[in-house]
């Protein structure tokens, strides 16, 4: 009977240990997924910022081009 109790205790102990290991791995996996989602959100924000910056540079380039054309026409065709 004592042998049976020890065996049962050992089985329960090993079951609890394996269960706690599985829960720990699950938590680690959830944390990794959360970090990946945060990284994706950051990259989406960075992409939006870059697009906005490129749009501003594009419009600035258009303005500078128009000014350069106006200056060139002024010097080439003085009135």
UniProtKB/Swiss-Prot annotation:
Residues 27-46 are annotated as: Disordered. One of its GO terms (cellular component) is extracellular region. Residues 1-22 form the signal peptide. Its main location: secreted. It comes from the Eukaryota. Keywords: Amphibian defense peptide, Antibiotic, Antimicrobial, Cleavage on pair of basic residues, Secreted, Signal. Coiled coil: none annotated. This is Raniseptin-9. The lineage of its organism: Eukaryota, Metazoa, Chordata, Craniata, Vertebrata. Belongs to the frog skin active peptide (FSAP) family. Dermaseptin subfamily. Residues 30-44 have a biased composition (Acidic residues). Residues 23-49 form a propeptide. Expressed by the skin glands. One of its GO terms (biological process) is defense response to bacterium. It is found in: Secreted. Transmembrane segments: none annotated. Has antibacterial activity.
